[in-house]
Design a protein with these regions (language model features):
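Histidine-rich, glycine-flanked metal-binding segment
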Residues: 30, 35-74
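Envelope-exposed proteins and targeting segments
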Residues: 26, 40-42, 119, 145
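Metal-associated gating/positioning segment near the N- to mid-region
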Residues: 72-141, 159-163, 171
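Hydrophobic/aromatic beta-strand patches that form the interior of the parallel beta-sheet core
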Residues: 25, 64-66, 150
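Bacterial Sec-dependent N-terminal signal peptides
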Residues: 1-22
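Short coil/turn connectors at secondary-structure junctions
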Residues: 20, 62, 143-147
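Metal-coordinating catalytic core of metallo-dependent amide/deamination hydrolases
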Residues: 143-176
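Extracytoplasmic
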Residues: 25, 39-41, 60, 103, ...
Length: 176
């Protein structure tokens, strides 16, 4: 008898978790890239991290409702060439000598979140130190916010080429 009540209780908890993961985006306009049309007054129903359906009008249900009635919603962008661990800056070469892996990880997390908030839902990372892989895993596990990352892990290149970490360094500093 206790097992039946426990099972019913667990089913109720899981149903509540599923309902909590449903989001209703009330959109003024949606850009339909597949058909080349602009759809007006639609509701996008998102369950977990998947678009479940698009409904006519502004609908509500059991879950979070986000009012975007004054906005145009479009599919996420894909950036096919990023290095999520860093950005071009006046201090980028100095940072190769001063930042450790933990510093790079914090910086990469901030870059990933900013990338997602800029509309890029997917990126192709073309190489890093390994932080890129850990960041991808953390995003996939819901630990941090960021885009879907497809990564090459380490950059590939020839000696002296773009991916050679000793490129442009003083010969005495390079080692063997």
């Amino acid at each position: 008898m206790i097992k039946k009540y426990l099972l019913a209780f667990l089913l109720c908890l899981s149903a509540k978790a599923i309902l909590a993961q449903t989001t209703y985006l009330q959109c003024g306009e949606i850009i339909d890239t597949e058909n080349g049309k602009i759809l007006k007054e639609k509701t996008i129903v998102v369950k977990a991290d998947t678009i479940a359906e698009i409904l006519n009008g502004y609908q509500e249900g059991q879950g979070e409702v986000i009012n975007l009635q004054k906005y145009t919603v479009m599919p996420g962008f894909i950036d096919m060439h990023v290095h999520i661990e860093g950005e071009t800056s006046p201090t980028q070469y100095l940072e190769e000598f001063t930042l450790n892996e933990a510093d790079i990880a914090y910086k990469a997390q901030e870059i990933a979140e900013r990338t997602l908030m800029s509309g890029f839902t997917t990126v192709r990372d073309l190489g890093g130190s390994g932080v890129n892989v850990s960041l991808r895993n953390a995003i996939n596990n819901g630990l941090v916010t960021g885009p879907r990352i497809y990564t090459a892990e380490k950059a590939l290149g020839t000696t002296g080429g773009h991916a050679d970490p000793t490129n442009g360094m003083k010969k005495e500093l390079m080692g063997d």
